[in-house]
A protein has these predicted regions:
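Conserved catalytic neighborhood of penicillin-recognizing serine enzymes
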Residues: 13-41, 162-169, 302-362, 396-399, ...
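Beta-lactamase-like hydrolase cores
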Residues: 98, 200, 216-251, 340-342, ...
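Active-site-proximal helix/loop microenvironment
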Residues: 154, 161-169, 374-440
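Active-site SXXK
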Residues: 1, 135, 222, 255, ...
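Short active-site loop at a secondary-structure junction
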Residues: 243-244, 268-290, 304-307, 398
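A penicillin-recognizing enzyme superfamily signal
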Residues: 212-235, 247-249, 260, 266-279, ...
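Short, well-structured active-site flanking segments
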Residues: 2-5, 80-82, 142-145, 297-317, ...
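Non-catalytic, structured segments within soluble enzyme domains
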Residues: 19-216, 220, 384-388, 398-402, ...
Length: 463
């Protein structure tokens, strides 16, 4: 532990006498931070880190600590640990790297993005020169060896996807792989108690085997459809952006996600926004079977042949004399069966039924029975004028017409609808089933959970 630097960093944090003082961490302290994920910016954290470092140095030799450090640091391109970095940048084992390639990796550590060999080869080359010169200055390298390394043409390896079965792009991993990585990373932390950094290191450098649920043939077909721009409208939307799309295909009986795609067109990077799992949108009328008609049937409020009045009820809501709710085509048929209301997606019928079901029962049904986790019970938002407004999805409009506060994901909507197919049983969607460690032991057994969401009678009516 460098007490002078540590104390100096602490004083600088309190007094702010320099903007570029640095963190004052030794390699041991940085290793502690990587292992614990303790990144709090405070004097207390620095002292806690220093004491942990002292304890670590009592039990391990310096070379062991350096090895652990090299196995945990980030090298960019989602590579944690020098072994994974060697695979990522050069598709080689660590022992196979040349001196120049080692210098390229060592140079990346200071700025994993800015010195990324794949993204910025020229910047990495400049940094590589600094590393080699420093090795000479420290007596670890001869000038002759440095000159030879400088002449070497260092090229990053590019994954063509030929050995991976990943058809989404020649360079980037698939949206499905992205989703699995995110889920396994989250589960390593929530189920096994790993810090984020420890989970990342284990995921990328720990030799894990992950059994996924993907069907390569189905995924390849989905990829081809989404990557063909002829399948999408050509112009910009009213907000100046291109219309987007995403898709999830799930086995309703097992919960296994067989394929997914997270956005229009070819994928443009690893771990980019996945609109199938990470984006929440108001579903509009697609919410009606989940929040209106299935609970209405289950609670005996309606039958498929029940008759309701297809007409606006309230002429004061909009303030322009037009009744509410209104159908999209502004046409009304008077006495109408539930079946017709569903077939034509009539807002008037949906509001009528939801009023009888009750908004709280509808909300509970969607969240507890059919797995919609992002519906909002109550949320305060500060408006532009400084006032605070409370939003809630436990209301007529959100639950009957899908204008939700946060929205829902395509993945959760897919799982909710699957209950109508699976005899009224809701099954949690899964992207992988097992994670094995490098010795073949099961780390995570991720089996889907199936619960009875509705009676078979309701299910039969809905189908």
């Amino acid at each position: 532990v460098n007490w002078r630097r540590t104390i100096g960093a602490g004083l600088n944090y309190l007094l702010h006498f320099r903007d570029n003082f640095g963190g004052g961490s030794t390699i041991t302290q940085q290793l502690i931070k990587n292992l614990t994920g303790d990144n709090d910016t405070s004097v207390k954290r620095k002292l806690r880190e220093a004491m942990r470092a002292l304890e670590l140095e009592k039990n391990y030799e310096k070379d062991d600590i350096l090895e652990m450090y090299l196995n945990t640091i980030y090298f960019g391109q989602n590579a944690y640990g020098v072994k994974q970095a060697a695979k990522t940048y050069f598709n080689k084992e660590l022992s196979e790297l040349t001196l120049a390639e080692c210098a390229a990796l060592a140079g990346t550590v200071k700025n994993p993005f800015g010195y990324d060999l794949k993204r910025f080869p020229e910047a990495n080359a400049q940094r590589r020169e600094v590393v080699l010169k420093r090795m000479v200055d420290c007596g670890n390298l001869s000038e002759e060896a440095r000159q030879a390394a400088l002449k070497e043409d260092v090229q990053a390896w590019r994954d063509t996807g030929e050995d991976t079965g990943d058809s989404s792009d020649d360079q980037y991993q698939s949206y499905f792989t992205d989703a699995v990585i995110r889920q396994v990373l989250a589960d390593l932390q929530s189920e096994l108690g790993y810090s984020k950094n420890m989970a990342l290191q284990l995921l990328y450098s720990g030799g894990l085997k992950i059994v996924t649920t993907v069907d390569p043939d189905i995924q390849a077909k989905m990829d081809a459809v989404f990557q063909d721009e002829e399948n999408f409208p050509g112009g910009l939307g009213s907000d100046g952006t291109y219309p987007q799309a995403s898709m999830v295909l799930m086995d309703p009986y097992t919960g296994h996600v067989k394929a997914l795609y997270g956005g229009r067109g070819e994928k443009e990077g690893d771990l980019v926004l996945n609109r199938a799992t990470q984006t929440y949108r108001s579903p509009g009328s697609a919410i009606k079977p989940i929040t209106v008609y299935s609970p209405g049937l289950e609670y005996g409020v309606i039958t498929p042949i029940s008759v309701v009045d297809d007409a606006p009820k309230d002429f004061t809501v909009r303030g322009n004399g037009e009744g509410w709710p209104y159908n999209e085509n502004r046409k009304y048929s008077g006495q109408t069966t539930i079946l017709t209301g569903i077939a034509k997606s009539l807002n008037t019928v949906a509001v009528d039924v939801l009023t009888r079901v009750g908004t709280q029962r509808s909300y509970d049904w969607a969240t507890k029975n059919l797995g919609l986790t992002t519906l909002v019970e109550s949320l305060d938002k500060t408006q532009k004028d400084g006032t605070v407004r409370t939003y809630s999805d436990i209301d007529i409009s959100p639950l009957s017409m899908g204008s939700l506060t946060r929205g829902v994901s395509v993945l959760e909507m897919t799982a909710a609808y699957s209950a109508f197919v699976n005899d009224g049983q809701y099954t949690t969607p899964v992207l992988y089933t097992k994670v094995y460690d490098s010795d073949g032991n099961v780390l995570i057994d991720n089996q889907p959970v199936t619960t009875l969401a509705m009676s078979t009678k309701t299910r039969d009516y809905m189908i």
